[in-house]
Amino acid sequence: MKKIVILLLAIVPLAAFSQKRALYEFKKNMPVYCDSLIADMKYPLAWGQSDIHDFSQWKETARRKVFECMMTPPPAPQAWNVVVLGEEQRDGYVARKLEFQLSKYYKVRAYMLVPQDGRKKHPAINLLHDHGAHLFIGKEKMIIPFQEDSVIIKDAFDWQLKVYGGQFWGDYMARRGYVVFSADAPLWGERGREEGVDRSKYDMIAGNMQMYGRCLSAFMTYDDIATTELLATLPEVDADRIGCAGCSMGAYRAWMLSALSDRIKVGAAVCWMVTSDVQLTLKYGRSENGGFANCIPALRQYMDYPHIASLACPKPMLFINGMKDKLFPVPGAEKAFAEMHRVWDSQGVGERLVTELWDMPHGCPPEAQQRVVEFFDKNL
């Protein structure tokens, strides 16, 4: 009898979880009226739809609105207080692990690669890691880790095979003559949970941040802006030649950073561009329709993704999406690319925006990494 009671108690939570009512309002984590919401998105602050006709004034106004929607930033530190935790000699460049005060609230660790080619200063890339639903590592996805636990090192190499074709993007760029910098985003790597990785807690943490009047996604962007400012102060870096790049969430970070930081001169984004009407509909059978990693409250009342990315105009920008990418349907990428081309063309600099659709799934193989480096070679 005791065993029967225990079994019944074990079954009850499962039964409660699967309870359904005849009527409902949400389906596949989306409101059933999602297409009506999409129809009401008018984007009044987009270039060409705004009543501001001077491009510089529009950029200033639109950027100010983006920052307003990003809510309060983390307070700046009094000093960076950069400490070199370790160094490793590599083939033609040196790897360093740094720790620095990124905000008054927190210290952050990063990897930096410096070419040893006789030059005192180099062009630099803020290389921004992906999401991948894999939070155990962050910066280690971009640069070969060292002085780390073997579990972390193995995880980093496994991730390269899965997403980057077995080539560490940062180390490849360092061999091509670039200073490369990569830091963890909030919740990734050495900025994760004390209790360990649990992606199901991400949304709860993001919600708690909003209760503080802060935005977790915005903190990621604010941090990327701040690390770019730090990068400009380092003696090995030519402060007038800083670019940024990333894949997936790293691509989102790259075009957001390009749009919001004047320090960035050139940007490249691989596999993250779409329009909200394609991202937030049930039509394409997607299992995920965005999330807190790119959720900035109220911003969609004013601009869509390509409108925000267009704040990077007239900078040279490269966008690559995959035709087999299940996360970003081709119609959404094509619509976004067309909108951005309209903006760059309106300013007489259409040749500075390059958008490409590749016959590939979601990821950044060595061929795409090479394409990005060639773009930087030409424009940075």
Predicted regions and their residues:
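Cap/lid segment of the alpha/beta-hydrolase catalytic domain
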Residues: 120-121, 127-222, 232-233, 278-281
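N-terminal targeting or regulatory segments adjacent to alpha/beta-hydrolase or S9 domains
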Residues: 17-94, 102, 138
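Mobile cap/lid helix-loop segments that gate and shape the active-site cleft of serine hydrolases
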Residues: 204, 208-211, 226, 266-309, ...
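Alpha/beta-hydrolase fold nucleophile elbow
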Residues: 236-248
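Bacterial Sec-dependent N-terminal signal peptides
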Residues: 1-25
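Short beta-strand/loop motif that positions the catalytic acidic residue
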Residues: 312, 319-321
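Glycine-rich active-site/cofactor-binding loop and its immediate structural neighborhood
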Residues: 87-146
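C-terminal catalytic histidine-bearing segment of alpha/beta-hydrolase fold enzymes
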Residues: 292, 338-380
